């Protein structure tokens, strides 16, 4: 069993501010089942031409606490099924899918968000999303929801009736420029 310290960005992510502009497919083979990262922060940030994640079910997220910016600015990614992700220990989902403009399908049905405190900008600028099922989200510990759906221009309906916002201190511009929403259940 291998782990990381949670402070290093993986080698494949590089260190360019301009992002990764050549990788269209990422493959997680069987060997990833033995790797136990504690952070996936910025793992695929600015992979602007990434279109497919193969074998992502081999990525073991059991020990991950930080998923901040994991798919940030993955402009070309049309869908991602994260139904196998174990998010029980995650506290930070800030900008996790931010600026994934082509994202039309996102399966978060098994996300355990009971320990998450930061959802700031989680889906902002996801213009391709027309619907998003967050009915299983436990938001009791969340403090920051600022810009969570900012500029999600394709969203037509959103049901957040199960959201517990008791501890939220910032909801600024949460729905700003969500011009397509015709049904918002709070």
Regions found by a protein language model. Name each.
Residues 1-6, 182-186:
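Short intrinsically disordered, low-complexity coil segments enriched in acidic
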Residues 2-38, 42-45, 145:
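LRR flanking "cap" motifs
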Residues 22-35, 49-65, 75-91, 101-117, ...:
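Structural signature of tandem-repeat unit edges
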Residues 41, 68-69, 94-95, 120-121, ...:
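Register-specific detector for alpha-helical tandem repeat solenoids, activating on a conserved position
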